[in-house]
Every structure is written in structure tokens, then in C-alpha cells.
């Protein structure tokens, strides 16, 4: 059993290099496999899943902003593959680090904010005070709305990171307990299988939630 539970999230492989981050480049070889792989049940299921996802995103985005669907779908695939790859043995979980999730969330948020301020400045200022708010509370409403807009990339990043960390910690704890005896090892096997299935579902759900929130932010811009 490891002395530090969070050592599994350490990207360092030596004192000078963080080679674990190179696992992100594996996605470049996995993602375009449909261009050279022959049709199979897995490939057909994968394409059907992406088609359903693209339709869901299209329903949440205004017609004038449909050109953003492609980049949102790409972000979803990237996050999903990163989350699922982190469940494999000896593979570094990049999505469990804030530096990774902030790298995805902050540019989107900053782009939408700048676009709205440049093209729809009056509308942005008007949205800081919800319709029907008393005049006496308008100052506080502006502060609340401003803070809520500022923390959006933080909430996006922390939500994804926290869910990935919690799931991997549970898997690590359960696998560490199973090392004490053969009986615990046999008992923990079905629980480990169930937990891995749940974590796979969480990997999909968290990637979906991430891009759905981004699509909602696009509609507001």
C-alpha cells in the first residue's frame, strides 16, 4: 500500500521530467482510428454515440452558432478519452489535474466574455441586473452576477477534477485493502468491477456535462 494516496496523481517520473503528461499524445493515435480501421461493432457503436451526442449539442445551440458544434464535439471526445484512459493500469490521469481542466475551460470562457463585451456590450451590462429586481438591490445583484460569471471556468474545472480524483481514490483504496489477504482479494474483485463500470459512466457523464455547460455559455454570448 502506498504511503501517499495522492501519489497516483503525481505527473513526475523523475526529478527533472514530467513524462506522464505524454499520455495526452496517445489520444492523437486513438482518436482518428476510424479513418483506417475496418467497420466493427465497436466502431459502429462509437459512431452512433457521437451522432447522438452531436444531435444533443445541436439542440442546445442556436442556429446562428451551429459552427461551434464541431469544436465542442472535439472537446467532448478529448475529455472522454482522457477520462477513460486514466482508468487503465499505469496510465496517468491527466483530467484529475486543475492545470489540464483549466486549460480547457478558461480559453472558452475568456473567448465568450470578450466576444460578448465587444459585440453585445449593452446586453451584457443589462444581464447583470435580472429583470424585475428591486432598484435597492441592483448594486448587490451586479456584484453577484459578476462573481458568478467570473467563477464559471473554476466551477467547470473543479467539477471535472474532483469527480476524477474521488473515483480514482476509491479504486486505489479498494485495491490497497485487497492486498492484505487472499480473502479480501477475492471479495474485492466484484466490487472493483462494479466500481470500474461506474467510473466509466462518470467519465462519460462528466465530459458530457462539461461541454453542455460550454454550449449554454455559447448561447449567452
Swiss-Prot record:
Residues crossing the lipid bilayer are: 24-44, 69-89, 98-118, 124-144, 169-189, 194-214
Its main localization is mitochondrion
What family classification does the UniProt entry report for this protein?
Belongs to the ATPase A chain family.
| PROSITE patterns linked | ATPASE_A
Q: Which organism is it from?
A: Rhipicephalus sanguineus (Brown dog tick)
- Does Manganese count among this protein's keywords? no
UniProt-recorded name of the protein: ATP synthase subunit a
Q: Which Gene3D superfamilies match?
A: ATP synthase, F0 complex, subunit A
One GO CC term on file = proton-transporting ATP synthase complex
Q: Which terms does the record give in the GO molecular function aspect?
A: proton-transporting ATP synthase activity, rotational mechanism
Query: Where, per UniProt, does this protein localize?
Result: Mitochondrion inner membrane
Q: How does it sit in the membrane?
A: Multi-pass membrane protein
Say what the protein does: Mitochondrial membrane ATP synthase (F(1)F(0) ATP synthase or Complex V) produces ATP from ADP in the presence of a proton gradient across the membrane which is generated by electron transport complexes of the respiratory chain. F-type ATPases consist of two structural domains, F(1) - containing the extramembraneous catalytic core and F(0) - containing the membrane proton channel, linked together by a central stalk and a peripheral stalk. During catalysis, ATP synthesis in the catalytic domain of F(1) is coupled via a rotary mechanism of the central stalk subunits to proton translocation.
Provide this UniProt record's keywords sorted from A to Z: ATP synthesis, CF(0), Hydrogen ion transport, Ion transport, Membrane, Mitochondrion, Mitochondrion inner membrane, Transmembrane, Transmembrane helix, Transport
Write down the InterPro entries for this protein, in alphabetical order: ATP_synth_F0_asu, ATP_synth_F0_asu_AS, ATP_synth_F0_asu_bact/mt, F0_ATP_A_sf
What does the annotation say about its assembly with partners?
F-type ATPases have 2 components, CF(1) - the catalytic core - and CF(0) - the membrane proton channel. CF(1) has five subunits: alpha(3), beta(3), gamma(1), delta(1), epsilon(1). CF(0) has three main subunits: a, b and c.
Amino acid at each position: 500500500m502506498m504511503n501517499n494516496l495522492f501519489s497516483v496523481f503525481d505527473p513526475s517520473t523523475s526529478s527533472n521530467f514530467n513524462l506522464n503528461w505524454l499520455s495526452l499524445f496517445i489520444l492523437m493515435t486513438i482518436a482518428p482510428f476510424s479513418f483506417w480501421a475496418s467497420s466493427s461493432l465497436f466502431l459502429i457503436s462509437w459512431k452512433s454515440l457521437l451522432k447522438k451526442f452531436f444531435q444533443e449539442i445541436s439542440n442546445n445551440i442556436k442556429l446562428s452558432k451551429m459552427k461551434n458544434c464541431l469544436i465542442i464535439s472535439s472537446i467532448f471526445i478529448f475529455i472522454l478519452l482522457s477520462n477513460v484512459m486514466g482508468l487503465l493500469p499505469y496510465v496517468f490521469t491527466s483530467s484529475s489535474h486543475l492545470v489540464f481542466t483549466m486549460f480547457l475551460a478558461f480559453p472558452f470562457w475568456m473567448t465568450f466574455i470578450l466576444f460578448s463585451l465587444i459585440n453585445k456590450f449593452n446586453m451584457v451590462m443589462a444581464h447583470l441586473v435580472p429583470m424585475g429586481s428591486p432598484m435597492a438591490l441592483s448594486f448587490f445583484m451586479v456584484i453577484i452576477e459578476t462573481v458568478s460569471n467570473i467563477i464559471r471556468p473554476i466551477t467547470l474545472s473543479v467539477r471535472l477534477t474532483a469527480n476524477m480524483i474521488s473515483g480514482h481514490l476509491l479504486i486505489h483504496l479498494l485495491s490497497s485493502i485487497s492486498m492484505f489477504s487472499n480473502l479480501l482479494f477475492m471479495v474485492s474483485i466484484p466490487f472493483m468491477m462494479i466500481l470500474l463500470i461506474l467510473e466509466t459512466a462518470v467519465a462519460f457523464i462528466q465530459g458530457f456535462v462539461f461541454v453542455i455547460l460550454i454550449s449554454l455559455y455559447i448561447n449567452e454570448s
